[in-house]
A protein has these predicted regions:
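Short strand-coil-strand connectors
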Residues: 27, 36-38
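Conserved catalytic cores of phosphodiester-cleaving nucleases, focusing on short active-site segments
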Residues: 33-35, 42-48, 62
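Non-catalytic C-terminal interaction segments of nucleic acid-processing enzymes
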Residues: 25, 68, 94-144
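Short loop/turn segments at strand-loop or loop-helix junctions that form parts
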Residues: 38, 47, 76-81, 111-116
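Structural motif
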Residues: 40-42, 73
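Catalytic cores of nucleic-acid endonucleases
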Residues: 48-99
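Acidic-basic catalytic patches of nuclease active cores, encompassing PD-(D/E)XK
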Residues: 1-25
């Protein structure tokens, strides 16, 4: 999905309002879309690339932003390729999210395939039961 198209979609979540759409959130950080409810954030990135480093970078930037009073989740909307599936990226990010736990208020990362998030050009309501069914959810849990 093209960047501009993604940013112009009507992303929604119960109780949240669009806070930022492609603008600079903080120095050097321009996520595709951010929804906000008080100090609770939903940060969204849509990526068509295949670089696992890119997804890790998105997660690190969200983790760095979500500190002090700010808390929230990250949603990665991914166009799958044979060498880059949602499941593969989730497994790759899982241990890094656990490692980041003491440093951030980023607690959950959702990964969802583009066509599942936006069937018929209408995005799913974020965090809805349908969204939860279609996405892979990784939590910041300490590995033992």
């Amino acid at each position: 999905m093209k960047d501009k198209l993604f940013k112009n979609l009507l992303h929604s979540a119960e109780g949240y309002a669009i806070f930022n759409s492609g603008g600079q959130l903080t120095k050097g950080y321009k996520p595709d879309t951010v929804l906000k409810c008080g100090e609770d954030y939903i940060i969204m990135e849509c990526d068509t690339g295949t670089s696992r480093k890119g997804y890790l970078g998105s997660m690190l930037k969200a983790a760095r932003y979500l500190t002090k009073e700010k808390k929230g989740i990250l949603i990665l909307v991914i166009k799958e390729k044979p060498n880059t599936t949602v499941k593969q990226i989730a497994e790759h990010l899982r241990e890094y999210l656990a490692w980041l736990k003491p440093l951030t208020n980023l607690r959950i990362v959702y990964l969802i395939e583009t066509t599942k998030y936006c069937p018929d050009k209408i995005p799913l309501k974020l965090l809805s039961s349908e969204f939860e069914k279609c996405a892979i959810k990784i939590k910041a849990e300490i590995l033992k």
